[in-house]
Swiss-Prot record:
Belongs to the type-B carboxylesterase/lipase family. Disulfide bonds join 45-72. It comes from Culex quinquefasciatus (Southern house mosquito). It is found in: Synapse; Secreted; Cell membrane. Keywords: Cell membrane, Disulfide bond, Glycoprotein, Hydrolase, Membrane, Neurotransmitter degradation, Secreted, Serine esterase, Synapse. GO terms for molecular function: acetylcholinesterase activity. It catalyses: acetylcholine + H2O = choline + acetate + H(+). It is an enzyme of class 3 (hydrolase). This is Acetylcholinesterase. PANTHER family: ACETYLCHOLINESTERASE, ACETYLCHOLINESTERASE 1. Glycans are attached at residue 37. The lineage of its organism: Eukaryota, Metazoa, Ecdysozoa, Arthropoda, Hexapoda. It comes from the Eukaryota. Pfam families: COesterase (PF00135). The keyword Hydrolase applies.
C-alpha cells in the first residue's frame, strides 16, 4: 500500500532462560547500556519443526523462519508512520497450542496491520514444547 511503519525487533523482556534459568519462570531482562540494535527478528524458541507434510509452501510457511534458540524471550513493536496520537495497541500472541510457533512468521506480517489499521502491534516470543 506504500504506507510506512517503524519497527523494533528483538527487544528483550526477560533474561535468556539458559543454564539454571532453563526451567524457571522468566526473570526480568537486565538493563543494557548504549543503543540496542533492534533491527532484526529475534530467535524462535526451541521446538520440533514439522516435516510431516513435506517441503511445500503451504506447510513450510508455519515453520520457524529465524534460528531456534533457548535465548528467545523478546518482543517486537511495529508503529504506523506518521505516529498516531491515540492509537490502539494490539498485543499479538501467536497460536500453536504451546507446541510450536513464532511471532516472526511471514504470515504474521505486523507491518500490514500497523499500516492499514493504524494500530501499534506488539508481539512476543514465548517458550513452547518441552521448554515452555
Amino acid at each position: 500500500s506504500g504506507k510506512k511503519v517503524d519497527a523494533w525487533m528483538g527487544i528483550p523482556y526477560a533474561q535468556p532462560p539458559l543454564g539454571p534459568l532453563r526451567f524457571r519462570h522468566p526473570r526480568p531482562a537486565e538493563r543494557w547500556t548504549g543503543v540496542l540494535n533492534a533491527t532484526k527478528p529475534p530467535n524462535s524458541c526451541v521446538q520440533i519443526v514439522d516435516t510431516v507434510f513435506g517441503d511445500f509452501p503451504g506447510a513450510t510457511m508455519w515453520n520457524p523462519n529465524t534460528p531456534l534458540s533457548e535465548d528467545c524471550l523478546y518482543i517486537n513493536v511495529v508503529v504506523p508512520r506518521p505516529r498516531p496520537k491515540n492509537a490502539a495497541v494490539m498485543l499479538w500472541i501467536f497460536g500453536g497450542g504451546f507446541y510450536s510457533g513464532t511471532a516472526t512468521l511471514d504470515v504474521y506480517d505486523h507491518r500490514t496491520l500497523a499500516s492499514e489499521e493504524n494500530v501499534i502491534v506488539v508481539s512476543l516470543q514465548y517458550r513452547v514444547a518441552s521448554l515452555g
